[in-house]
């Protein structure tokens, strides 16, 4: 099968240098057609792993199957991130195993039960008015500037406010949260070369612990209080679990939604008919199409615990299996005209919040609401937004990130 592929020798689907320039759209489409489960060879030590490579899973049905079979495909074994900064050693990868993202059942089940109490539709809905007011303020303030960096001035703040609001983080501390989360996900990008992801994570964890101590003494109506008081089947969160959960919230909740907002606006400028439609109709289906189109997390991985097979391909115990959500979300067998941005797409069974199963994004409702509120505000106050430059992409092996995007907010540029 490999002989029929047009991939250059040594092509690596988690190579951050590729994502700094572009998404490997054509290469993934070719794999879906020719070799939907393909062995990606890697030199020993590449991206923090010494196992010689991984399986690239490109089709929607296979991504969903790997997600579902959590008894066979483990998040814990080698964590869910398919790429670490080159030079990362095994102990550093091991340290991430406390994060909910990297847990397996039954421990994952206990933790998720505790945390899910904070993400009920009612808990999320309670934030709507505050976040709507904030979204309108963010967009009005940026519009008054005339032009600027859409990522920094528009996209980044509301996702952070949503998570911080849920956690009960005081307003004066919220920019610290933003700063730490940026440092943690940008560690493969030269712009953030001075960043120390480890130090940022330590600061974030210690901030979380401090917040927990305050809430233990003075409970509030927020996520941190719920986590501190939580007891599911005799299980309370340990300090490590709590600290790493704060990291997951600050990074997973903030970075992914921010990138969806930026990439969604990029899509609207590329498909102006959809922007006209959105401004008139404000369809409820738009947020899911924005997430499908953006797929902010390009891929996560699992590791086979036993010899198994996936769509006829033999997978050995210990081999990594990387689910390319980006590919699954453009699978021609599932999505009609997948390369058309269509805000009325319904049904839209995208895997932008992860596949089905135990690790489906716990904050999906909050993300949808944040995206909705933000685009409503943009349509209200920046209906004629125009790009001034090409977006600058983040160098990352798994996050489809945009660092900067210069735009004209009022639409005077031609």
Q: Which residues make up each language-model segment?
A:
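Cytochrome P450
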Residues: 1-414
């Amino acid at each position: 099968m490999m002989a029929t592929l047009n991939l250059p020798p040594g092509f690596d689907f988690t190579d951050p240098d590729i994502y700094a320039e572009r998404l490997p759209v054509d290469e993934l489409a070719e794999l879906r057609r020719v070799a939907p489960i393909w062995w990606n060879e890697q030199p020993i030590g590449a991206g923090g792993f010494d196992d010689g490579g991984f399986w690239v899973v490109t089709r929607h049905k296979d991504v969903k199957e790997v997600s579902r079979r959590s008894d066979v495909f483990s998040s814990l074994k080698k964590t869910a991130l398919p790429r670490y900064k080159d030079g990362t050693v095994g102990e550093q990868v091991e340290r991430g195993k406390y994060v909910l993202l990297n847990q397996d059942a039954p421990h994952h089940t206990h933790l998720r039960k505790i945390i899910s109490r904070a993400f009920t539709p009612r808990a999320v809905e309670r934030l709507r008015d505050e976040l709507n007011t904030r979204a309108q303020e963010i967009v009005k303030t940026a519009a008054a500037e005339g032009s600027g960096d859409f990522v920094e001035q528009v996209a980044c703040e509301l996702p952070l406010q949503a998570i911080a609001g849920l956690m009960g983080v005081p307003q004066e501390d919220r920019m610290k949260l933003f700063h730490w989360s940026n440092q943690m996900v940008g560690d493969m990008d030269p712009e953030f070369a001075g960043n120390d992801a480890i130090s940022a994570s330590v600061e974030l964890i210690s901030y979380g612990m401090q917040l927990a101590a305050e809430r233990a003494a003075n409970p509030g109506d927020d996520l941190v209080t719920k986590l501190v008081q939580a007891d599911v089947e005799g299980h309370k969160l340990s300090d490590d679990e709590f600290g790493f959960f704060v990291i997951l919230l600050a990074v997973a909740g903030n970075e992914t939604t921010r990138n969806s907002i930026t990439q969604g606006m990029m899509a609207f400028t590329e498909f102006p008919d959809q922007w006209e439609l959105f401004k008139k109709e404000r369809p409820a289906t738009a947020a899911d199409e924005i997430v499908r189109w953006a797929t902010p997390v390009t891929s996560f991985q699992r590791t086979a615990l036993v010899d198994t097979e996936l769509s006829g391909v033999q997978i050995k115990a210990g081999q990594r299996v990387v689910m390319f959500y980006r590919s699954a979300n453009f699978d021609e067998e599932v999505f009609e005209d997948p390369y058309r941005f269509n805000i009325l797409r319904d049904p839209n069974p995208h895997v932008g919040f992860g596949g089905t199963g135990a690790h489906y994004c716990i904050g999906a409702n909050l993300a949808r609401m944040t995206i909705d509120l933000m685009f409503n505000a943009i349509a209200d106050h920046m209906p004629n937004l125009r790009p001034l430059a090409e977006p600058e992409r983040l160098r990352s092996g798994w996050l489809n990130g945009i660092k900067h995007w210069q735009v004209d907010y009022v639409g005077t540029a031609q």
